[in-house]
Amino acid sequence: NEAVEHAEIQMLASIFGAITLLCWITFRSWRAVLCVIVPLVIVTIMCNALMALLGIGLKVATLPVIALGVGVGVDYGIYIYERLQHEMTHAGLPLREAFYEAMRQRGTAAVFTAVTMSIGVGTWVFSALKFQADMGILLAFMFLVNVLGAIFLLPALAVWLGVGSEEKAPQQELAHS
């Protein structure tokens, strides 16, 4: 169990490290990185809590479940954040309107993907194999809660972190010069 716990820490550090690096390269903003990463971290903690609640032990077989859930879940955040950033940068929209446009353009696809995938893996709950049933519960949970994090937590973090203000501040200073 100690070896599996150590492996989980290494796996999560590797996954979140890679996501952080790729988000930084893609968006060139620490605010963007936090907007994408924080919901994923929270859902990962919630998944571990669900495992404890349901008595699903942390085993070599269950380690990849969280990695897969994070790997798919990051897509939802990236879909929405990319569109949010695009609408603010190219269309000049304020954050609230940019989020509306991001949801209009990418939200339906993200929700459809999450629901479809959750239903697909959710059917595994009826499997006679306990491992497959456990995976179905955990993956369906992660897919759905990750999309909810991207829809609700990501924009809240964007507002709290002042996304969009980092581009406007230098422009406002130039305008006052």
What is each stretch, according to the model?
Residues 1-14:
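Juxtamembrane "pre-transmembrane" interface segments
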Residues 32-81, 149, 159:
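Hydrophobic transmembrane alpha-helices and their membrane-interface caps
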Residues 36, 40, 67-68, 101, ...:
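Alpha-helical transmembrane segments of multi-pass membrane proteins, especially transporters
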Residues 18-24, 46-57, 70, 107-165:
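Hydrophobic, glycine/alanine-rich multi-pass transmembrane helices and their short helix-loop junctions
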